[in-house]
């Protein structure tokens, strides 16, 4: 019996991980967010970063975005406690990365969220409480613009 050229064995797929360096393709912010986004006008105004990110989230439900925002809000709330350990809160925030990777693996539309989180959440970008607060402000603004643009179905029609 003749074997197929691309057959690699039972249960094996060819080119399963064609982009093994996906994270390297994503621009990671390499300085604290409160410094990177010091000019709030470039962040919050309709031609700013939050609006552009909301446009890129076309096809993603508000529910998926709010799941992440809820975790960010829990981190902010935890920082308000006197006993809060910043490293614990930071690690809790970093747990969003594998969660979003899993969701992106299940639904390709959600990979944009993972890419956004990889860009914004790393050891260099989250160095103090103020960075987590800036991330919260950014993501809250993204969701607001996403909703304004029509959420999942109509993002991009309000241009």
Regions found by a protein language model. Give the residues of each.
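Small/polar/charged residue-enriched interaction surfaces, especially the RNA/DNA-contacting tracks
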Residues: 1-159
């Amino acid at each position: 019996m003749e074997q197929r050229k691309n057959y690699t064995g039972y249960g094996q797929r060819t080119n399963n991980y064609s982009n093994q360096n996906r994270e390297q393709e994503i621009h990671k912010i390499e300085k604290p967010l409160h410094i990177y986004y010091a000019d709030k006008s470039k962040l919050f105004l309709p031609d700013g970063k939050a609006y552009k990110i909301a446009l890129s989230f076309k096809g993603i439900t508000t529910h998926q975005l709010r799941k992440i925002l809820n975790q960010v809000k829990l981190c902010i709330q935890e920082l308000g406690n006197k006993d809060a350990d910043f490293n614990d809160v930071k690690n809790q925030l970093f747990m969003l990365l594998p969660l979003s990777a899993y969701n992106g693996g299940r639904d390709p539309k959600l990979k944009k969220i993972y890419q956004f989180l990889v860009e914004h959440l790393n050891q260099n970008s989250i160095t103090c409480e103020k960075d987590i607060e800036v991330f919260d402000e950014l993501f809250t603004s993204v969701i607001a613009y996403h909703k304004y643009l029509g959420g999942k179905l109509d993002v991009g029609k309000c241009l």
